[in-house]
């Protein structure tokens, strides 16, 4: 029996400090040990789907109720929802206008300012002082806003729904959330407070 088939899945794995559910699974079942095997392209979560024979796409896609055939397989359902919504967010243009991504545990973010107001067209002599570009910490933090959506789903209404159909609906929610974040990001890019941070990446 492979290691991924021996893991005891618990709801508490979603609440470990500083770890996502997939990271908690990876700690118990590292993907590195599956190199050069048929499972090499799967992450720890996808291996659990394989363990419980849950197919989330394709011709033989399962229905929602397949997640709830056991208490352990049911633990995988919230991550299915999260991944579907995340795919929707990633399909927005947010990544196209972001030079870097920083995870922040507080409600404020203190970035960097880039001052390169001196022209780059200046030709310098051998002994002359070089034009300067200054990078410094911002004096005023950016107040981070939270975007979320409560999704109410009746189990009786969707238990027989195909997982790929549910995923499409969740991706739609994610895309709209992503577009809302894009709108806010563009506003920050245009503002005096966010311009230097945005330029610095």
What is the meaning of each model-derived region?
Residues 21-26, 30-36, 132-133, 140, ...:
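Short alpha-helical interface patches
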Residues 61-147:
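Assembly/oligomerization interface modules of large self-assembling protein complexes
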Residues 1-70:
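Intrinsically disordered, low-complexity terminal tails
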Residues 23, 47, 66, 79, ...:
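Charged/polar, solvent-exposed surface patches and flexible loops
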Residues 2-5, 38-44, 113, 128-139, ...:
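Phosphate-binding glycine-rich loops and adjacent basic patches that engage nucleotide phosphates
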Residues 15-19, 108-110, 146-153:
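Short, exposed beta-strand "edge-strand" segments with a Pro/Gly-rich flavor and a Y/T-containing core
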Residues 149-201:
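Alpha-helical scaffold segments that mediate packing/assembly in large oligomeric complexes
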